[in-house]
Amino acid sequence: GGYGSDALRTIVKHGFEQLNLNRIWCEVYSNNDAIGVYRHIGFKDEGTQRQTVFKNGEYLDSHLLGMLRSDYDKLKEENKIWKT
């Protein structure tokens, strides 16, 4: 992975393993290429709000993505993306 996905994995790992969070979520606009990184490391699509912001002459959708502790634990157990 690149620097962005490595940094995101570090933050998510800290959230679940050090802060003992049950859920981590983010809101990403449809023009943000980083949405693929979130999905790649295991965030799931939880909903879309259509045309929530007007930017650079166009309306953009807002996507809600989330990861549960149980998702993280399963991905770690399967050694997918989350090498310890």
Question: What kind of feature is each model-predicted range?
Answer:
Residues 1-14, 36-40:
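Conserved acetyl-CoA-binding loop-helix of GNAT-fold acetyltransferases
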Residues 29, 69:
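Residue-level recognition of the GNAT/N-acetyltransferase active site
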